[in-house]
């Protein structure tokens, strides 16, 4: 089975298009390319129960972001301000850059 390419990078602005957080916009905090999952700021929040230990004396319930599948988010274009599909374009100098599928604006 061929691995899908993750064209979304850290610090990109994305919109959730499926799941319990559908319609929310956030910034990508980390990308796991092996599992095709992203951690997005304030999206897919879960609660973790922690025991008291040396670094966290009190313990308790901590709320944090959980990974979300890459297929459930779309990149937000800075120019047309909508969620878009990403196309790859090769420049004259040989570099490959990401491009907005609607307005053809370069993202990188």
From Swiss-Prot:
<comment type="subunit">
    <text>Part of the 50S ribosomal subunit.</text>
</comment>
<dbReference type="GO" id="GO:1990904">
    <property type="term" value="C:ribonucleoprotein complex"/>
</dbReference>
<comment type="similarity">
    <text>Belongs to the universal ribosomal protein uL24 family.</text>
</comment>
<dbReference type="InterPro" id="IPR041988">
    <property type="entry name" value="Ribosomal_uL24_KOW"/>
</dbReference>
<keyword id="KW-0689">Ribosomal protein</keyword>
<dbReference type="InterPro" id="IPR003256">
    <property type="entry name" value="Ribosomal_uL24"/>
</dbReference>
<dbReference type="GO" id="GO:0019843">
    <property type="term" value="F:rRNA binding"/>
</dbReference>
<dbReference type="GO" id="GO:0005840">
    <property type="term" value="C:ribosome"/>
</dbReference>
<keyword id="KW-0694">RNA-binding</keyword>
<dbReference type="GO" id="GO:0003735">
    <property type="term" value="F:structural constituent of ribosome"/>
</dbReference>
<keyword id="KW-0687">Ribonucleoprotein</keyword>
<comment type="function">
    <text>One of two assembly initiator proteins, it binds directly to the 5'-end of the 23S rRNA, where it nucleates assembly of the 50S subunit.</text>
</comment>
<dbReference type="InterPro" id="IPR005825">
    <property type="entry name" value="Ribosomal_uL24_CS"/>
</dbReference>
<protein>
    <recommendedName>
        <fullName>Large ribosomal subunit protein uL24</fullName>
    </recommendedName>
</protein>
<dbReference type="GO" id="GO:0006412">
    <property type="term" value="P:translation"/>
</dbReference>
<dbReference type="Pfam" id="PF17136">
    <property type="entry name" value="ribosomal_L24"/>
</dbReference>
<comment type="function">
    <text>One of the proteins that surrounds the polypeptide exit tunnel on the outside of the subunit.</text>
</comment>
<dbReference type="Pfam" id="PF00467">
    <property type="entry name" value="KOW"/>
</dbReference>
<dbReference type="InterPro" id="IPR008991">
    <property type="entry name" value="Translation_prot_SH3-like_sf"/>
</dbReference>
<keyword id="KW-0699">rRNA-binding</keyword>
<dbReference type="InterPro" id="IPR005824">
    <property type="entry name" value="KOW"/>
</dbReference>
<dbReference type="InterPro" id="IPR014722">
    <property type="entry name" value="Rib_uL2_dom2"/>
</dbReference>
